[in-house]
Each structure stands twice: as structure tokens, then as C-alpha cells.
């Protein structure tokens, strides 16, 4: 395991600071998931996953419901899922996931954010191979040993379980996200502090001085883009 959640979450802090931005991004993601299949989360696994994630960010129920109702309507707005890979200062690697109804606009915006802030766009696969796609769950009130026992009883294998920051963090294969979550719920665990699929860097680097300043400006510029849903990188940030 290249990264612990206690460190990964520091990378998320700048994006997570603005509730209105989080709500808007989840509104689009929920709409797309509901539009791609049945708008009922009980029968639409993709939609159920997005809603579970939204709950860990405290997205209000009315925003979730509004996005689902919009998907039930006659609108035919089409969104594409895109991934951009690139490089920042001094060996830093960045992955940008976007959800857009205008591919050309998004590509131009992401490219401009890189070029104006000391970064460079890479080709597909130039960065992603240095990250591990990972399902992550956070549970309070139980320790790693207790969760391991629960999962073993349910015959569910995971990569690792660690006690971090006053909670137990489960790392699993991304394709096992729903199996792990349903197994935990069957054991009586209904609330999660984290329920995500993340790209975790295999190795982190440290930046300082001007390189760190440039990097933080680049990440801010990418996260501020309307179509960007997630930004992953391999830089260790201070608390």
C-alpha cells in the first residue's frame, strides 16, 4: 500500500473546502448515473455508489433528489467521462478526472491550467501506471481487527485494514466496492466516514519552496475547473 488515507485526505482538503462546489459536482455525477440506467438506486448500482459517496460529503438530500428527478425528465444532456494525465514541478504526477457535456471546452481548460501553472499534459497512460485504483472505506467505532473478523466471516477479501486517525480504514479492490460495502452493512455498519474509489500513488514525493508554490497553484487551478470531478497526485502535503 503506497499511501495511507490520513495523508491522502490532505490532498483533498482544498477541493473539499467549498460546499457549493462539492454539491454542484455531485449533482452532475448523480444526474449522469441516474440517466445511464434506472433512476432507482436500489436497482442502479452506479447510482447507489455515487449517492453513498455524496453522503460522506454531507450533500443534502434535496440536492440528491433534484438530480434524480432531473434525470427522470425528458432532457437529453449528454456527459462524457474523461481522464487527463500530466506532470507538475520536479517529478510531480497528476491525474484529472472530468465529467463534461463539452469535451473540447474541458480539454482546452485543463490544458490551459497546466500550461499557465508550470505543468505539462501527458499522453494517456503516462502517469496512471504509478497509481493503484483502490476502494476505500472509513469506519468509526470499530478497530481494524474487528473489521477484519467481520469481513472474514462474510468471506470477503480486502487488501489491507489499518487504524488511522481515530478510525479504521479498509483498502480493497475497486471491483469489490459494493461487495465490501454490503458485507459491512450486513454486519450492522451503516455509516461511513469514507466511501470512495481513489487513485493512490505507489510512491510520494516532497516538494518545497518555489516548486511547492507552483504545484499548489496548479492543483488549485485544476480543481477550480467546472468540469473537473477529482484530482489525484503524488505529492506529500503538510497538515
Curated annotation (Swiss-Prot):
Report the Pfam families cross-referenced here.
TACO1_YebC_N, Transcrip_reg
Instruction: Give the similarity note.
Output: Belongs to the TACO1 family. YeeN subfamily.
Gene Ontology biological-process annotations: regulation of DNA-templated transcription
Q: Which InterPro entries match?
A: Integrase-like_N, TACO1_YebC-like_2nd/3rd_dom, TACO1_YebC_N, Transcrip_reg_TACO1-like, Transcrip_reg_TACO1-like_dom3, Transcrip_reg_TACO1_YeeN, YebC-like
**Species of provenance:** Listeria innocua serovar 6a (strain ATCC BAA-680 / CLIP 11262)
Q: Name one GO molecular function term.
A: DNA binding
According to the UniProt record, one GO cellular component term is: cytosol
For this UniProt record, the keywords arranged alphabetically read as follows: Cytoplasm, DNA-binding, Transcription, Transcription regulation
What does the record give as the organism's lineage?
Bacteria, Bacillati, Bacillota, Bacilli, Bacillales
Q: What name does this protein carry?
A: Probable transcriptional regulatory protein lin0388
Q: Where in the cell is it found?
A: Cytoplasm
